[in-house]
Design a protein with these regions (language model features):
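Hydrophobic H-region at the start of alpha-helical membrane spans
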Residues: 9-10, 237
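Exported/periplasmic ABC-transporter solute-binding proteins
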Residues: 25-100, 104-293
Length: 293
């Protein structure tokens, strides 16, 4: 009888160890834009792993990949800094706003120009303004850098928020790059360039972030809507996602999760609660389909 008791006890202990190991080994994978990763996902996922033991692996690839891979079942979660587009490969996902970012217009640190108007930005990317002296700077040619394609997170949102035209072509003289990372590196190393990025990423680089309409790109100005080029950041999940994904969503939307987001300098949903009406109007002005954002 004693041997049987010992046997059952050993099995019970083994069962506990197996369950514990399974819980520790549980893993979710996330893929998406680098801006979203830097804005919140890196620190939120680290805190979630410490709290629950669930490991979250992070991969880049851009906002479009963050949406498409989740839709195709290749990733549990994604990150995007743009809304869903009406494309077949982007169907079947939910985009959950978790915080607010803003487009940043960046240049080299040595550039004495501090501020641009929206009209000046339009003319620069149209190729109508080609020299920094035309906007109060020195006699140096402007080197425009931009993301390839028109549906990247930064590229799409720049076209909608600044130009009100998602199909807008930038100047043919623009230097095109594959992602925001290389664009930011060019701004760090190359004098007289100008390009769009996201503040959540750009502020961690050695670049100059230009004011727009005299407004600094600060947490307070984004939250108050004073800085005009704000946009939501999204967590992407599959419709009908499993419970582990839903648990993470609950965490990131909780006060604890939002506090982590704020600690990263990203505007929280609460602090940016008054931005939605303006943002919705901006999207409609750009001809964006209601319900996609």
């Amino acid at each position: 009888m004693r041997k049987i008791s010992i046997l059952f006890g050993a099995v019970a202990v083994l069962g506990i160890l197996v369950v514990g190991t399974t819980a520790q080994a549980l893993e979710l994978n996330w893929v998406g834009c680098g801006i979203t990763k830097k804005a919140f996902m890196k620190e939120v996922s680290r805190a979630y792993t410490e709290k629950t033991g669930v490991v979250i692996t992070l991969q880049g690839g851009g906002a479009t990949r963050g949406i498409v891979d989740v839709a195709a079942g290749k990733a549990d979660m994604g990150g995007s800094c743009r809304h869903v587009l009406m494309r077949p490969e982007e169907r079947g996902v939910r985009l959950i706003p978790v915080g607010w970012d803003a487009l940043a217009v960046i240049t080299h640190k040595s550039n004495p120009v501090d501020s641009l108007t929206l009209e000046q930005i339009k003319n620069i990317f149209d190729g109508m303004i080609i020299n920094w002296k035309q906007v109060g700077g020195p006699d140096r040619m402007i080197k425009v850098i931009a993301r390839e394609g028109k549906i990247s997170g930064v590229g799409r949102m720049a076209r909608e928020l600044v130009f009100k035209n998602p199909k807008k072509d930038f100047t043919s003289d623009a230097k095109l790059v594959k992602s925001s990372g290389p664009l930011e590196k060019m701004a760090e190393k190359t004098p007289w360039v100008v390009g769009f990025s996201g503040i959540s990423s750009a502020r961690k680089r050695n670049v100059k972030i230009l004011k727009i309409e005299g407004k600094e790109l600060s947490y307070q100005n984004i939250a108050a809507g004073q800085y005009l080029l704000f946009r939501p950041l999204y967590l992407v999940i599959k419709r009908g996602a499993n419970q582990e994904v839903k648990n993470f969503v609950q965490f990131i939307m909780s006060q604890e999760g939002q506090n982590i987001i704020k600690g990263e300098g990203t505007v929280t949903l609460k602090d940016g609660s008054n931005l939605w009406r303006t943002y919705t109007a901006q999207m409609r002005d750009a001809g964006t389909t209601p319900g996609t954002f």
